[in-house]
């Protein structure tokens, strides 16, 4: 019987998506995220509140590696990447890393217990791929395989991106998704009526993961996934460009985004910690955008900019 190695990284909630990305890049066959915030004040299936869940800013991200993997090298790489993330200003907290061996059947089911359907916005619900789910009238279901995911849609940065897309898209638009990761924003754009979506990621693993998740959802043939370095070399104009990545990377794409966004189109930027907010605003204003909406969840910010000559009700430019 094949055995697996389980590695659990205890890290600050703000680093969830970045650390999940690192674990996938180092060869993990899946990630699971345990976050006390998902349970605070919620009821279990029998109607009882979870009594023993204590709120914490720290979460546990668990990854699974084949038994042949050299765990010492993996853990060293994880620690190096965490130090680099901290140097970008991302809060990682007091990190600890644990490991243990698991039998095949334990690995196959262990991570699934962390995921249940989650209503993210008024219309959008994210459902694990193995779950049978009866959608209500008007509810749009995004199927994801969280075992592969770079983000399952429940992180504040992704939630705010999804909310912005839901507010903007009315049908028939062209959307560009920069740093697509799990593909969740592209899938949502398709479900919300966008005509064509172009999804780019520098990471070949992310491109594969995004395509696999897209294939789980019917009617998403209008999503085109490809490897790409932000918006370099892209000539396709878009009604909406969305990017949910680190602030230091967002500032590198604002000029290209202005070149590609159509008149009266939108740029959605998320993944911005508060201390980097002014830097992103300055880059977008310098490119020529006007700020229409600023959303905040905890230390995270999302910004919706517009390319327009009508500056009533908008800021900057």
Swiss-Prot record:
EC numbers, comma separated: 2.1.1.-
Transmembrane segments: none
Binding sites annotated in the UniProt record for S-adenosyl-L-methionine: 158, 179, 201, 244
Family assignment from sequence similarity: Belongs to the methyltransferase superfamily. PrmA family.
Main location: cytoplasm
GO molecular function: protein-lysine N-methyltransferase activity
Origin superkingdom: Bacteria
Name of the protein in question: Ribosomal protein L11 methyltransferase
Catalysed reactions listed for this entry: L-lysyl-[protein] + 3 S-adenosyl-L-methionine = N(6),N(6),N(6)-trimethyl-L-lysyl-[protein] + 3 S-adenosyl-L-homocysteine + 3 H(+)
Protein's GO biological process: methylation
Cellular component terms per the entry's GO annotation: cytoplasm
Transmembrane helix as UniProt keyword: no
Role summary: Methylates ribosomal protein L11.
Keywords noted in UniProt: Cytoplasm, Methyltransferase, S-adenosyl-L-methionine, Transferase
Gene from which the chain derives: prmA
Subcellular location: Cytoplasm
